[in-house]
Amino acid sequence: MRIISGTLKGKKLYKPKDLLTRPLKDLTKESIFNIITHSNKFSIALEGANILDLFSGTGSFGLECLSRASKHVTFVENYKKILPILKKNIADLNCEKKSQVIEKDINNSSSFKIIQNQFDIIFLDPPYKEKKLLEMLENIFQSNLLKDKGIIIIHRHKKEVDEFPEKFNIIEEKSYGISKVIFGNYI
């Protein structure tokens, strides 16, 4: 697991040894960033962007954003076994000044209130069996976390059948092995 592009290109990231954590695979991550950079379906620039990385895990997505000149990443993670790895990856890449780690479970509406900013990109990578995606997307909308032209990127198991809020617009969906990635926004 590594940083694919940008100022930190080639830097290795620590990953957990347990099987409960499912780090974002390099091929999937590279495809996501190719879509962000080259899609004509939405217009978002990584340079100078504010990023919210929910269920951050090792921080692979957010750190890739920082490597590609994003302004700031807010990492949200509550799994106690992965938090030291997330913090080590941030420190080893000297990204502490451009990041914030929130150690919080975000499975209810009140937990979203501690997040004070608006974001250009919100990345959700919940555990594959997580059933509260609809509720999380509604909380993101109600908390006004996404900027007007921002996008939400969701990484899920491809067999998951998810419900989406009425105001959520799926822009693009791609499959990679056993996972799928959904790009969307609010209309």
Model-derived features: positions:
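Class I S-adenosyl-L-methionine-dependent methyltransferase catalytic core
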Residues: M1-I187
